[in-house]
Amino acid sequence: MADQADLLESPQFEEETSMQKFKRRLKEEPLIPLGCAATCYALYRAYRSGKAKDSVEMNRMFRARIYAQFFTLLAVVAGGMYYKTERKQRREFERKVEERKAQEKRDAWLRELEAREKEDKGWRERHAAVSEAANNPVGVSAVVAGKKEEEEKGVDGNVNQAPQEEGGVKRGTGILDAVKALVRGKKD
């Protein structure tokens, strides 16, 4: 377990972009691109010799292409054996980084899911309270009576209320007012 933490905190390995990786691999194994370039040059020269109808030069260039490909393959195998342990460590490091990123992504997803669930639960509770208030006329009248008492005490400072008629009787007492009272009652 300690070696995994050391592997993640090791200054030897760090996350790199594709260009950084290309440059690093070019510095580690410069013979592979050299062999590829030699192969391409031999093919180009063989093509030019074929166009010039020089079959001797063309055959010579095709042999040079085979030698260049052998050299490239040899460089790949030798580099693979030489950098075997480092590549294994780097793969392990990259695997750990990917696991960490996947875990962070999963945790963020779970947090979002919990927030949505909490929001949905709150909506269901509000919906249940509204349904109960709408279905229970006794509860509505009790809520309306409680609201009238609050208005008389001057506790209710809501500007967006229906205007009151003369004589203190409020116009528009109904389900909407009951719902507002329920919501306000839960906030207090």
Swiss-Prot record:
What is the predominant subcellular site recorded for this chain?
mitochondrion
Q: Which residues form the HIG1 domain?
A: 3-94
**InterPro entries hit by this protein:** Hypoxia_induced_domain (IPR007667), RCF1 (IPR050355)
How would you describe this protein's topology in the membrane? Multi-pass membrane protein
Q: Where in the cell is it found?
A: Mitochondrion membrane
User: Using the chain's own numbering, where are the disulfide bonds?
Assistant: none
Coiled-coil segments on the chain, per record? 83-119
Keywords in alphabetical order, please: Coiled coil, Membrane, Mitochondrion, Transmembrane, Transmembrane helix
- Which residues span the membrane? 30-46, 66-83
Q: Name one GO biological process term.
A: mitochondrial respirasome assembly
One matching Pfam family is HIG_1_N
Report the GO terms under cellular component: mitochondrial membrane
Q: Where is this region: Disordered?
A: 147-171
According to its UniProt record, which protein family does this protein belong to? Answer: Belongs to the RCF1 family.
Describe its function.
Answer: Cytochrome c oxidase subunit which plays a role in assembly of respiratory supercomplexes.
Subunit composition?
Answer: Associates with the respiratory chain complex III/complex IV supercomplex.
Instruction: List the protein's name.
Output: Respiratory supercomplex factor 1, mitochondrial
| Organism listed in the record | Talaromyces stipitatus (strain ATCC 10500 / CBS 375.48 / QM 6759 / NRRL 1006) (Penicillium stipitatum)
The gene it comes from is rcf1
